[in-house]
Design a protein with these regions (language model features):
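A short helix-loop-beta-strand connector motif used in the catalytic cores of GNAT acetyltransferases and
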Residues: 47-62
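Aromatic/hydrophobic pocket-lining residues that form π-stacking "cages" and hydrophobic walls in ligand
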Residues: 19, 112, 169
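Conserved beta-strand in the GNAT
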Residues: 62, 69-78
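Short amphipathic alpha-helix that is part of the acyltransferase structural core
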Residues: 2-48
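Acyl-donor binding region in acyl/amide transferases
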Residues: 83-166
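Single conserved hydrophobic/aromatic residue that forms the stacking wall/gate
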Residues: 168-177
Length: 177
């Protein structure tokens, strides 16, 4: 695969289904990744069904390679309530899945950063969900153990990709005191 990556914003329900499906395709047959329930994913990501959209907005993106294959996905989320409470201008990224290609992961992160900047945000944090009740975080060890359907599972290369894209070094909320 070459590094010609297009980032496509999701604007339809069909696109949202494709966004959700990518996770299943990426981890198909993986013995430690436990798939999320599709209807839970759809209910969480659908603005008409998730009450968090009363104070959040989101944009979903897919990465497509030069052969029109989907090679990654990411959600950009702005939680206006949290930003107001913490006096921040943060865009969150979540639902971050990608093939092992740094051009893909960095292009997806840039898409969220740019979307956030267009909405007045000045900091990108994640992986996070709409609220602290959603799955969040990144697996950095324990790749040889089964996950649960409530914990993000990711391939070991995710950490290296985030470090390469210069976003992994942000302190976590726990480290901020």
């Amino acid at each position: 695969m070459n590094d010609e990556i297009r980032i496509i914003p999701i604007t339809t329900k069909k696109g949202l289904k494709t966004f959700i499906q990518f996770h299943y395709d990426l981890y198909r047959g993986h013995k430690f990744a436990i798939p999320f329930l599709r209807f839970d994913e759809m209910n969480t990501l659908d603005p008409k069904k998730n009450p968090a959209f009363e104070f959040c907005e989101a944009q979903y993106f897919l990465a497509v390679d030069s052969e029109a294959r989907i090679v990654g996905r990411i959600a950009g989320i702005i939680n206006h309530r949290a930003n107001e409470e913490w006096n921040k201008k943060q865009v969150r990224f979540g639902w971050f899945d990608f093939v092992d290609n740094v051009a893909v992961s960095c292009a997806l992160l840039r898409a969220v950063e740019n979307w956030g900047k267009s909405k007045g945000m000045n900091e990108c944090v994640g992986p996070l969900g709409f609220t602290d009740m959603d799955r969040e975080g990144l697996l950095i060890e324990g790749f040889d153990r089964k996950s649960t359907m409530y914990i993000n599972y990711n391939y070991p290369y995710y950490k290296t990709h985030l470090e390469s894209c210069l976003l992994y070094t942000s302190p976590s909320p726990r480290d901020r005191g």
